[in-house]
């Protein structure tokens, strides 16, 4: 969703977007619920593969955006010496759809979509 918003604002050439999870198993495809939520927005997760957060990955980034403040807190505990700025994408909080039905993934997508304009302005 962020890539699509950046493209819409003509910013894709300036910003590279990476996705990683604090408990992700690297190489897994997106869940069916996530795929359906993105399809409803004309987006595809067909090529998406999960990736676990690593210290090396964090240090290559210029900004880390967590879906919740608890994600940011966890990253700061795991990588206390990481110099990369971190912000939470949680005003209001993004619901966690993990293990939920299609409605849970749709709600999370709506939560993220609602906050994209503020994130784009921040960038």
List where the protein language model places each region.
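Conserved active-site segments centered on acidic
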Residues: 1-59, 121-122
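Functionally constrained cores in energy, signaling, and assembly domains
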Residues: 22, 30, 35-37, 47-48, ...
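A short linear-motif detector with a strong N-terminal bias
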Residues: 42-45, 64-68
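Phosphate-binding/catalytic loops
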Residues: 63, 69-123
């Amino acid at each position: 969703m962020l890539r699509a918003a950046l493209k819409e604002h003509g910013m894709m050439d300036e910003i590279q977007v990476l996705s990683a999870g604090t408990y992700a198993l690297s190489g897994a495809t997106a869940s069916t619920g996530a795929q359906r939520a993105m399809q409803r927005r004309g987006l595809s997760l067909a090529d998406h593969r999960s990736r676990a957060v690593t210290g090396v990955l964090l240090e290559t980034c210029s900004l880390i955006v967590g879906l919740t403040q608890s994600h940011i807190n966890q990253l700061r505990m795991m990588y206390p010496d990481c110099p990369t700025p971190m912000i939470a994408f949680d005003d209001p909080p993004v619901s966690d759809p993990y293990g939920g039905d299609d409605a849970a993934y749709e709600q999370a997508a709506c939560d993220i979509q609602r906050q994209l304009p503020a994130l784009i302005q921040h960038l």
